[in-house]
Amino acid sequence: MIIIVCGSDDTDKSYISTNMKKTMKALVYEEYTTDDDFSKILKIKDLPIPEPKSNEIVFKVKAAALNYDDIWGMRGKPLAIPLPHISGTDAAGEVTAVGEDVKNFKVGDRVVSHGNMSCRVCKRCTSGREYDCKKRTIWGFETGPLWGGYCEYTHLPEVNVVKIPEGVSYEEAAAASMTMLTSWHMLVGRAKIQPGQLVLIMGGGSGVGNYGIQIAKLFGCTVIATASPDKLDQLLELGADYAIDHRKDDWHKEVRAIAKKIPKAYGDTPGVDVIFEHIGGSHWNKELTLLNYGGTVITTGATTGYMAKTDLRHIFFKGLNILGSTQGTRAELEQGFYWMSKGKIKSIIDSEYTLEQAAEAHTKMLKGKGLFGKIIMKPS
């Protein structure tokens, strides 16, 4: 099918659609789960293939990556997301159609989603803080009904897709879309890491932790990473200089001992300069004791609990910086992909599933046992 739309200037505006089939399969749920039995609600449905609006592209999904917000969505907590729902924030694929106003993409381009959807015109957006936009929504989590990446074809505004560079696969790009972006924004955009710093990556076995280790090493930092004991060797293989079991009650004492041994070429006080935090819970105060004077903790989540007690003496006495972070900018995603194309950052893929195996895939992510890196789903 070829559709030509004439523009007002001398150049024809057009989009070419190669979607010959009329329907596609999609992973849909129409109710929330109360017991995390995802198999009860996840169903494969036949839906119409989307056609692009004037500013949109449609792409055939080759790979999509799981995120924890998929589980929040299926629970309907902390947000009651639109129903019926298609999840999937991180999707990569091949462009099959473009709207008449699309300028920078064409049919056949390899693209990946940038799931942070914002108004693009408010003061926050135009100052480079689109992640703080009051109208921000997360595509595939808050959008809908029936608008996400777990399907054969999906659509997004041109501004919410990024070209995949040569040498990066669809699977690697999907894995990196939100997770690498989040890690890059935490360390580079917010904490502004510098060569020679000592960086503690909490939960290094997770998706964000994997990228956090690599980004810190890219910037010439010394890295201590934590994980469960079965993942410590993998942290070292990924580039961490030291690996610590954070399930031990005294894990922070091991970190402190390492910090005292490391020559401080950029200061005279031993301690951690930057803590990459997304665990929260009972670890929080232990982390604060490890920071150097003027040190920074950058947090983007709290998988072990939100209600962390804080000993304020650590903060005011040492002049600590506590920074929050969510996602990042489209430009930061492109920066990360540049380094991926140079082989300096890689995506760690734990496992791959089909859409029909979605319940099993999400259960694995929820339990986390033996999980190292990202879980990928493919439509076929």
Predicted segments, located by residue:
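C-terminal hydrophobic helical "lid"/dimerization subdomain
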Residues: 21-22, 330-380
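Glycine-rich beta-strand-centered segment in the early N-terminal region that forms part
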Residues: 48-65, 77-126, 147, 165-168
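NAD(P)H dinucleotide-binding glycine-rich loop of Rossmann-like/cofactor-binding domains
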Residues: 117-203
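Mid-domain Rossmann-like dinucleotide-binding core that forms the NAD(H)/NADP(H) cofactor-binding site
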Residues: 168-249
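Glycine-rich cofactor phosphate-binding loops and adjacent beta1-alpha1 units
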Residues: 224-227, 234-321
